[in-house]
Amino acid sequence: MTFLRVVKNKAYFRRFQVKFRRRREGKTDYYARRRLVAQDKNKYDSPKYRLVVRLTNKRVICQIVSSTLVGDKVHASADSSELVHYGVKVGLTNYAAAYCTGLLLARRLLTKLKLDSQFVGKVEADGELYHVEEEDNERRPFKALLDVGIKNVTTGNRVFGALKGACDGGLHVPHSEKRFPGYSVDDENNGSYDAQAHRDRIFGTHVANYMEYLKEEDPEKYKRQFSAYLKLGLDSESLEDMYAKAHENIRKNPVLPTKPKRKLKHVREGSKVLTSKGSYVRNVKISKAQRRERVKQKISLLVNES
């Protein structure tokens, strides 16, 4: 095979076609999105729902989204920062928090659709595979496809923790056990799944084990790294109870009460704006008619003087 040098001449640049902006920025995988959005031609006006999971440095965000010609429509959303109201005040980005966020999203969506009593899901998380579509129900469960964006889908990723939480919450998301923690392949390429290892991740046992290890090996680093846990009186033995209570609280009331809207306060007095630290002058913007009237007054004043 000969080496061909790419000649970037005028013809090259005339025929060059740039990729979509969000693909150039590394934000959207259009190859995957086209397959997640496209609906069968014989299913008229029936949306295709996606379970969108996004991970940031401080939060885990889960949404149920459907695509339209106008744009994407969000039907329900859950954020790991909301777990503070359910008893989880620290560790809002780990695998256990991702599971709680997925569970919160599922229960919130089913409550909104008034299907929470019909599709209860798996009340006690044990790490075993659970498919709500295998149960005998009067109607089909709510189906959504997992949308991971441009995230690398490695085994044990937190994205699949949110997936497991949504499935245990009563949603039908097609999946297998191959990407869950506890799945391994031997030398003969035979896979096996350890549900207990997955359960340990759901209840934060891996964090508790590291807390015990760090407490014995390096107490100063333990106090520094887990200072937020220690301020709340949490240790390695109380983490599992914290997540178990959070699962129970989420199922009791997945919908947070809406805050009343704050009343608007008039902070302007003429050209003065009042703040908590004092006041400052900001002239009121006049209208076009007022500007014209002011110009007329100046013209008439100049005419009278002359």
Curated annotation (Swiss-Prot):
Cellular compartment(s): Cytoplasm; Nucleus
InterPro entries noted in UniProt: Rbsml_uL18_euk, Ribosomal_uL18_C_euk
Keyword Ribosomal protein appears in the UniProt entry: yes
Cellular component annotations (GO), alphabetically ordered: cytosolic large ribosomal subunit; nucleus
CDD domains, per database record: Ribosomal_L18_L5e
Coiled coil: none
Pfam families documented for this protein: Ribosomal_L18_c, Ribosomal_L5e
Keywords in alphabetical order: Cytoplasm, Nucleus, Ribonucleoprotein, Ribosomal protein, RNA-binding, rRNA-binding
Keyword Ribosomal protein: yes
A biological-process GO annotation: translation
A molecular function GO annotation: structural constituent of ribosome
Positions of transmembrane segments: none
Function, in words: Component of the ribosome, a large ribonucleoprotein complex responsible for the synthesis of proteins in the cell. The small ribosomal subunit (SSU) binds messenger RNAs (mRNAs) and translates the encoded message by selecting cognate aminoacyl-transfer RNA (tRNA) molecules. The large subunit (LSU) contains the ribosomal catalytic site termed the peptidyl transferase center (PTC), which catalyzes the formation of peptide bonds, thereby polymerizing the amino acids delivered by tRNAs into a polypeptide chain.
Family designation: Belongs to the universal ribosomal protein uL18 family.
The protein's assembly and partners: Component of the large ribosomal subunit (LSU).
HAMAP family linked: Ribosomal_uL18_A
Protein name: Large ribosomal subunit protein uL18
